Regions:
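Bacterial carbohydrate/catabolite-sensing allosteric modules
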Residues: 10-220
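Structural motif
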Residues: 1-5, 67
Length: 220
């Protein structure tokens, strides 16, 4: 089970637990629900993405963050803040742009807003590639040079990140491996329950990697 971005509470999950139905959470999870989980360290991955922008010379970095409730959006926001703090860059809440929905159109709208406000932003960490591609599309339309004027990095490593111009730097989230691990955990729980044995929930954490591409790779 991967929670919807619109999920605000967990009673339906608790009902599954109370009925002893085997299930595994992956990707978007409810941390406090005691089930098996397949996760990545969103906070660490986001911190590494923002650190890459800083290493490329960015000093005023915006964050297009996800919705308020999903745990992965919260963790990525915290990773953004941690990277700034570790590099002595003051956090500015005015550089955080919360999505109302995770869409290409949101990326376009925030790109417009960033250009109109003209705050001197030179780097953007975006919650996910779909939104980041919207940002790049608008910057391309307006003649903004990426990464020379503004560097952009996304998250997820969707196929779309490699077909946009410039190619999008992103964080590789191992989706296939996540699916395999979730299936194996679910199968293990089903087998154990059929044998009448108790089952201790397990947590599998998969590694992520910053994929450096054209949207951040500045010439030094």
């Amino acid at each position: 089970m991967s929670l919807s971005n619109d999920t605000n509470n967990d009673p339906h999950i608790l009902e599954i637990m109370n009925n002893e139905i085997p299930f595994v959470q992956f990707d978007k999870i409810a941390k406090l629900i005691p089930s098996s989980k397949v996760i990545i360290n969103d906070r660490k991955a986001a911190q590494e993405a923002v650190q890459h922008l800083i290493d490329m010379g960015c000093k005023k970095i915006a964050h297009i963050r996800g919705l308020e409730n999903p745990q992965n959006a919260i963790d990525r926001f915290m990773g953004y803040k941690t990277a700034l703090e570790k590099n002595g860059i003051p956090f500015d809440s005015k550089l955080v742009y919360p999505c109302k929905e995770i869409t290409f159109e949101q990326g376009v709208e925030f790109a417009k807003q960033i250009l109109e406000e003209d705050k001197g932003i030179d780097g953007i960490f975006v919650i996910t590639d779909l939104v980041a591609v919207g940002v790049l599309a608008h910057f391309n339309e307006k003649g903004i040079r990426v990464p020379e004027d503004i560097a952009v990095i996304g998250f997820s490593n969707w196929l779309v990140s490699q077909v946009i111009t410039p190619k999008l730097s992103t964080v590789d989230q191992p989706s296939y491996e996540m699916g395999v691990a979730a299936f194996n955990l679910l199968l293990e729980e089903i087998v154990q329950r059929k044998k009448g044995k108790g089952f201790e929930p397990k947590i599998v954490e998969l590694a992520t990697q910053v994929i450096v591409s054209e949207s951040t790779l500045r010439k030094k």
